[in-house]
Amino acid sequence: MINVYFSDNSCKQFLPGIKGSDIITHLFPELLNKAIAIKINDKSLDLSTEITEDCKFEVITLDSDEGLDIIRHDTAHIMAQAIKEMFPEVKTVVGPTIKDGFYYDFSTDHIFSSNELEKIEEKMREIIKKNESFIREVWTREEAIRFFSNKGEDYKVKIIAKIPIHENITVYKQGSFIDLCRGPHAPSTKISKAFKLTKVSGSYWEGNTNNAQLQRIYGTAWRTEEELKLYLNNLIEVEKRDHRKIGKELELFHIQNEALGQIFWHEKGLIIYRIIENYIRKKLENNGYIEVKTPYLLSKTLWEQSGHWDKFREHMFLSEIDNKVVAIKPMNCPCHVQIFNSKIRSYKDLPLRMAEFGTCHRYEASGALHGLMRVRSFTQDDAHIFCTEDQIIEEALKFCNLLMEVYEVFGFKDILVKFSDRPEKRAGSDKIWDKAEEALKASVKAANLNYVLNPGDGAFYGPKLEFTLKDAIGREWQCGTLQMDFVLPERLGAYYTGSDGKKHHPIMLHRAILGTIERFIGILIEHHSGKLPIWLAPVQLSILTITEDAIDYAISLKHKAMKQNIRAEVDITNEKINYKIRSHISKKIPVLWIIGKKEIETESVSIRYLESKDQHIMSSDKALKTLLSCASI
């Protein structure tokens, strides 16, 4: 008999060879219609898996995230089968699941068009209607290579060559289609009913632009048609809010092929950038941070000492100067340690909170670049706190409180915190890990935040917190981080003299609130759909004239507003007033003052706000005072 343990710590005995589906039938009949796969010792497997030894057993249901991921995995296979039946000459490459869906890469001379997606969907529905079983088989390496070679599936052969020699080669069959796959899959194709193919794009084998170009078809799949409809409606909203589109319309920034992954900030976009930077700078000053500036170009030797050369070299931009290899910095932390090391430090100097708006560069494949969200050149609101072990809790709490204050100001109140604790392989003593982990937990609790545990997912040099924002349409954006580091100060020779007169390495806290300014601006644009809060809007006030007689009054009001640091502009063109109003609303100007004969006579303005069609008259002095009350923070 074998012992099978369950999540409630109970144990049942079964004959070896019992299938996962039989255990569910016997013990969990209420889950029969919801079960899609099982977990044996935390490994996801098919329902038909035979259990031959003692294990921990869990049921994966359709209503779980893992269950939904399996539905999407199934649908990717069904799409590949449909395409192979419609276009036999097409070669399959890889088809993973991704956030909210899946994709599959194909090698073919045929150019897939968006119009063909509906026909592919029809073929997929035919396959689903047949209710074909997903059948798992284990093949020898030789069998797999021979089969896929005979089929001309060269990319599958390349994938097999990279599978470790000790691992089984598994394939899945559904109907006439056979694909290389680890699984798991649902019992049959019938579960994948709510899906939609969304777009076609180019890609490269292994993401390397030097390799042959492939074609990638994206899709999404959900449990029900209702969920699918909700998601597709959300996609329309996402498209409306696309920061690249809004950024162009509002003349904030642009990107061009001569500088891929780098931003050309226009006047209005740079205003937003500077407001955010200066706001964060002031918050840091008020919280005891010093600001520094470090070089962009540093010798390879520093990156070797820090350990980044071995782990991060492929993402560095390298050059050679005076016969020495140099790199544009991809991060600021080793530079901050150099400033710490520039003088003798005492325990009385700690904590030392060192901040930098550090511009960094990292290589990203061109296909991965995405507007402001994924770039090669970016500025971090970076800071490092050098402290003693006894100061960790207080510093972590102060950071969490600061971070929450900032997020609330920018309009984010729904924050998810992920806590990653010690991995098996790690540096530092259990004592310091205990203290660091307790500090992070305590700081999150004191800030009235809940956290999700990522067990064992911390870096080898310390535990971390990740702060994820939920935007106006429910998307999640990971921005803030608090990462403990027990290793880098030691590697780079940082120490302070303790109260005992001995040398000690400081604990280093890597922390950021926004992440990068570029990406955070992209998130803000999409969160607010371009309608930024008044204090953040590049133009806060537009003064529109109805007649020529109003020009002098309008200009005088503009000067009056600008003296109070209001970012104002005046429109004295000959266009009709309704056209002017529409034009400035399309520019997302939060406040319009409309000036005509009546307003001149009464020294007033007619006010219209971006989110309202109503207009009301107010004296110019009162209108300015009202605007000033919300024009800055």
UniProtKB/Swiss-Prot annotation:
GO function term, MF aspect, one: tRNA binding
Cofactor: Zn(2+)
Disulphide bonds in the chain: none
Gene3D superfamilies attached to this UniProt entry: 3.10.20.30, 3.30.54.20, Anticodon-binding domain (3.40.50.800), Bira Bifunctional Protein, Domain 2 (3.30.930.10), Threonyl-trna Synthetase, Chain A, domain 2 (3.30.980.10)
GO biological process terms held by the UniProt record: threonyl-tRNA aminoacylation
The enzyme's E.C. designation: 6.1.1.3
Pfam families associated with the record: HGTP_anticodon, tRNA-synt_2b, tRNA_SAD
SUPFAM superfamilies per record: Class II aaRS ABD-related, Class II aaRS and biotin synthetases, TGS-like, ThrRS/AlaRS common domain
Primary site of residence: cytoplasm
Region (Catalytic): 242-533
A Gene Ontology term for the protein's cellular component: cytoplasm
Subunit note: Homodimer.
Protein family (similarity comment): Belongs to the class-II aminoacyl-tRNA synthetase family.
HAMAP family: Thr_tRNA_synth
Cited function: Catalyzes the attachment of threonine to tRNA(Thr) in a two-step reaction: L-threonine is first activated by ATP to form Thr-AMP and then transferred to the acceptor end of tRNA(Thr). Also edits incorrectly charged L-seryl-tRNA(Thr).
Name the UniProt record assigns to this protein: Threonine--tRNA ligase
Organism the protein comes from: Ehrlichia ruminantium (strain Gardel)
Annotated gene: thrS
